[in-house]
Curated annotation (Swiss-Prot):
The lineage of its organism: Bacteria, Thermotogati, Thermotogota, Thermotogae, Thermotogales. The keyword Mitochondrion does not apply. Gene3D superfamilies: Ribosomal protein S20. It comes from Thermotoga maritima (strain ATCC 43589 / DSM 3109 / JCM 10099 / NBRC 100826 / MSB8). Binds directly to 16S ribosomal RNA. This is Small ribosomal subunit protein bS20.
Length: 96
């Protein structure tokens, strides 16, 4: 345990920030999982695109808040869009 007053405050502040960051991370990870589950359940194109838009916004917000690094945000979005685009291509080929 810290003895110095400023060190005690740093402990309080860092714990508060850790919990806030954890909430942002959980939020965007859940949005990504929703998209992947929609793809797995073969949801319609509109539903998948709407969920993808929400996931992208959640990732961007986490990046802007400094919860994750901008490169990690870009990588997560790229991998998500790769899966979404692959799913949309399979939808188009099955409709033809």
């Amino acid at each position: 345990m810290p003895n110095i007053k400023s060190a005690k405050k740093r402990v309080r502040v860092s714990e508060k920030r850790r919990l806030r960051n954890k909430a942002y991370k959980t939020f965007f990870k859940n949005r990504i999982k929703e998209v992947l589950k929609a793809i797995e359940n073969k949801e319609p194109k509109e539903v998948v695109l709407e969920l993808t838009r929400k996931a992208q916004a959640a990732i961007d917000k986490a990046v802007s808040k400094g919860v994750i690094h901008k490169n990690q945000g870009a990588r997560r979005k790229a991998r998500l869009f790769e899966k979404v685009n692959e799913y949309l291509r399979t939808l188009e080929t099955t409709q033809e």
